Design a protein with these regions (language model features):
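Hinge/beta->alpha junction and helix N-cap segments in small-molecule ligand-binding domains
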Residues: 69-82, 100-108, 160-170, 186-230, ...
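Flexible loop/turn connectors
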Residues: 228-330
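Periplasmic-binding protein-like
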Residues: 121-126, 184-187, 217, 238-248, ...
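N-terminal helix-turn-helix DNA-binding module of bacterial transcription factors
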Residues: 1-59
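Alpha-helical recognition/docking segments in bacterial nutrient-uptake
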Residues: 60-64, 68-173, 234-240
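Short acidic capping loops at alpha-helix termini that bridge into adjacent secondary structure
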Residues: 182, 212-216, 265-271
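Short acidic/polar active-site loop segments enriched in Thr and Asp
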Residues: 13, 59, 121, 180-182, ...
Length: 330
C-alpha cells in the first residue's frame, strides 16, 4: 500500500493524503478521518525516515549484529570494531548519527520492533548470522535495511561484501603454489560468508586434483565454547597438515599461537592464510598472509545503499574484489 493507492481509494490527490497524515490544518477533519481510516485498514505506515531525508534532517542509523546459533559474537570482536568505525565515519561524513547495539531476535518482527522502540530511521546489519530468513521476511515490507554479508540468490535485500568465494579460492591457491598438499579449513561453515569461503577452498582443492578430506575441516569460531576443543583436535592432527586456510584473522592468530606453543615453525612446517586483513595480521609474528577486505569502501557503499533505500530508490548488491596480501606466514 502506497500513498498513491490511498489517494485513489479516497478520491483525493496524493498531496492531500500527505497533508492529512501529517495532520495539516489545510485538510478538513472529515477528509482526514477518511484518509486515516483507509490507511489503518490497509496497514499503511508513514515512512518517517524518508520524510526526514527529504527534509534534509539528520537520520539515526542503527548498526546491528545478528546472532548466530550457538556462537557468541560480540561487538568487541576486532572485525566488528573495524567495520563499526568505518560505518560511523561514512555516516558522519553525510551528516547522520550511528546507534550501535547487539540484538537477539525473538520473532519475525524484531527489526521493526527495534525501529519502533529505538526510533532509528534505518538499519545496517553486519553479517546475516543465522537470521537470513528473518531478514528476508522483514525486507519485503521494510526498505530501510543495508547488509554487510554474502549475496544470497532471490533475497529481497541488497548486500555489500567481499567476493567470499573468490577470496577463499585465492587463499587456497596461494597455499597450493607454496607446495602444500594437505590443506585444512578452519571456520564456522553455517555463516553464509564463511560457507562461500569454504566453497572457494573446495574449488581450488578440486582444481588441483587433490581429494577433499573432511577430517581436516574444522568448524569453529573464536569465543565459542567449543573453540579450545577444536584447537586440540587440530593439534592432534597437525602432522598430517601442511597448510591452513582460516576463515578469519582472529581464528588464524589463535591457531598460530597454539601451534607455536608446541614448537611448530610457521611457515616452514605449516603455512597459514587468514581472512580480513585486520591490524593484528601485520603486527603478529610471523606476520599473517591474509585476504584483504576493504572495510572503508564497503562502509561507504553500505551507507549509500541505505540512504537510497530510505529515499525509495532501487539498490543492488555489490561484491568487492578480495586482495591476497602476502606476508610471512605463507
Amino acid at each position: 500500500m502506497q500513498m498513491a493507492d490511498i489517494a485513489r481509494i479516497a478520491g483525493v490527490s496524493k498531496s492531500t493524503v500527505s497533508r492529512a497524515l501529517a495532520d495539516s490544518p489545510l485538510v478538513n477533519d472529515k477528509t482526514k478521518s477518511l484518509i486515516r481510516d483507509i490507511a489503518q485498514q490497509h496497514g499503511y505506515r508513514i515512512n518517517i525516515a524518508a520524510r526526514n531525508f527529504r527534509l534534509k534532517e539528520s537520520l539515526t542509523v542503527a548498526l546491528l549484529i545478528p546472532e548466530a546459533d550457538g556462537v557468541d559474537w560480540t561487538i568487541s570482536d576486532a572485525f566488528f570494531l573495524e567495520m563499526t568505525a568505518a560505518i560511523a565515519e561514512a555516516l558522519d561524513q553525510r551528516g547522520h548519527a550511528l546507534l550501535l547495539t547487539r540484538t537477539s531476535p525473538q520473532s519475525g518482527e524484531w527489526i521493526e520492533e527495534f525501529v519502533r522502540r529505538r526510533q532509528a530511521d534505518g538499519i545496517i546489519l553486519i553479517g546475516q548470522g543465522s537470521q537470513h530468513e528473518v531478514i528476508q521476511n522483514i525486507a519485503k515490507t521494510f526498505r530501510g535495511i543495508s547488509v554487510w554479508g554474502e549475496a544470497i540468490a532471490g533475497a529481497p535485500y541488497p548486500t555489500v561484501g567481499t567476493d567470499n568465494f573468490l577470496g577463499g579460492q585465492r587463499a587456497t591457491e596461494h597455499l597450493l603454489k607454496r607446495g602444500c598438499k594437505r590443506i585444512a579449513f578452519v571456520g564456522y561453515e553455517p555463516a553464509p560468508e564463511i560457507q562461500a569461503r569454504f566453497q572457494g577452498y573446495l574449488s581450488a582443492i578440486h582444481a588441483a586434483d587433490i581429494q577433499h578430506d573432511e577430517t581436516i575441516v574444522f568448524s569453529a569460531v573464536v569465543g565459542s565454547s567449543s573453540a579450545n576443543l577444536v584447537l586440540e583436535r587440530i593439534i592432534d592432527q597437525r602432522e598430517m597438515i601442511d597448510g591452513f586456510f582460516v576463515a578469519t584473522d582472529q581464528q588464524a592468530v589463535a591457531l598460530m599461537t597454539a601451534l607455536q606453543k608446541i614448537g611448530v615453525d610457521i611457515p616452514s612446517q605449516c603455512a597459514i592464510v587468514g581472512y580480513d586483513d585486520l591490524p593484528i595480521a601485520r603486527w603478529y609474528h610471523p606476520a599473517l598472509t591474509t585476504i584483504h577486505q576493504s572495510r572503508t569502501l564497503g562502509a561507504q557503499i553500505l551507507v549509500d545503499n541505505l540512504l537510497a533505500a530510505i529515499e525509495g530508490r532501487d539498490t543492488a548488491s555489490v561484491k568487492l574484489d578480495p586482495e591476497l596480501v602476502v606476508r610471512e606466514s605463507a
